Amino acid sequence: MKIVEVRHPLVQHKIGLLRDAALSTKGFRELVTELGTLLAYEATANLDTESHVQPGWAGPVEVQRIAGAKITLVPILRAGLGMLPGVLALIPAARVSVVGLQRDEETLQPVPYFERLTGRLEERDALILDPMLATGGTLIATIDMLKRAGARRIKGIFLVAAPEGLKALEAVHPDVEVYTAAIDDHLNEKGYILPGLGDAGDRIFGTRVE
């Protein structure tokens, strides 16, 4: 499985700022947006292109354009929405597919409660957006959903990832590419990433308990 930990100095600087527990909601949200743009830039570096001839100021000119159908972005509710503006700034024509999952209290497995996927997924690159890759359960369920709908080229973009989640993902979806700003140390007994970022959703939306 292709796993890319983006070591660009700007990415490392910004993920370090995100780890500050005293960072304001506004500051956290802005950094998540900026990191979304930077990580999406890395994740789209291997997209296929095709030649296209268009009018230029001195006559016809051959240029390169992204091949195939428009990319679809797949933010996982709710924290994934925080990354969406930054990625859309880079890929403004992208389609947006939104999924929401919650844990079944009996089986402890993630089950979908919201699903709005764009059409022709088999022709599109799908970029899953979620700040945290922890156990991998939610991500795996999202990929299962996308593949059932026809998606074939899937990448995941995360701010931080845990080794346990990466291992779980590789066991079932080794064809999925992962791009992250940091691979952290481990999960604690409650399944939280350490050192992590805290609850990214609460920090993005300002719903954490002060």
UniProtKB/Swiss-Prot annotation:
InterPro entries: PRibTrfase_dom, PRTase-like, Upp_B, UPRTase/APRTase, Ura_phspho_trans
Free-text comment on the cofactor: Binds 1 Mg(2+) ion per subunit. The magnesium is bound as Mg-PRPP.
Biological or metabolic pathway of the protein: Pyrimidine metabolism; UMP biosynthesis via salvage pathway; UMP from uracil: step 1/1
Record field: catalytic activity: UMP + diphosphate = 5-phospho-alpha-D-ribose 1-diphosphate + uracil
Pfam families: UPRTase (PF14681)
Required cofactor names: Mg(2+)
Regulation: Allosterically activated by GTP.
Any one GO BP annotation for this protein: UMP salvage
Signal peptide boundaries: none
Function (record text): Catalyzes the conversion of uracil and 5-phospho-alpha-D-ribose 1-diphosphate (PRPP) to UMP and diphosphate.
Family: Belongs to the UPRTase family.
Full protein name: Uracil phosphoribosyltransferase
Gene expressing this chain: upp
